[in-house]
């Protein structure tokens, strides 16, 4: 009835004569599914369904950011560092915070993937007049020059990722703990 219909009831799955349907099998086409993120990414581990968390920049890169963020157990890991943008993953332990900070020339975007927290922001270090609770899937936009802090108020690690424009940390940054992050920001003494 229809050209190249592969279903045993040819009228069940009609296919037009001009379609390239040589790959159809019971209504499934490989063109509808993109599995290249697994096969094409040599750092993807099929057996554990994990990704190697390291800095992939500045090369083109695609990642399941939710999976990578939830997988991360370090205080901070740079996932991608480019010329004008950086993506870092963070895991904030219960009762800890990212630390009160200010990036004079860097806008920042933070997305909470898992956990509960409190974000505080303000124009001065001693005057944080913006306060908002955050949960899973909340996004925080921090303008350059704004003092800010994110505090984990939940009973599990607060998993988030942060986007800096321009980059804030050196390529390949990995801070296992908040203490190591603070020590590296202070520099050698």
Model-identified regions with their sequence ranges:
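Conserved hydrophobic/aromatic beta-strand scaffold that supports enzyme active sites
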Residues: 78, 87-91, 109, 131, ...
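Conserved short histidine dyad/triad with adjacent acidic residue
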Residues: 72-74, 86-105
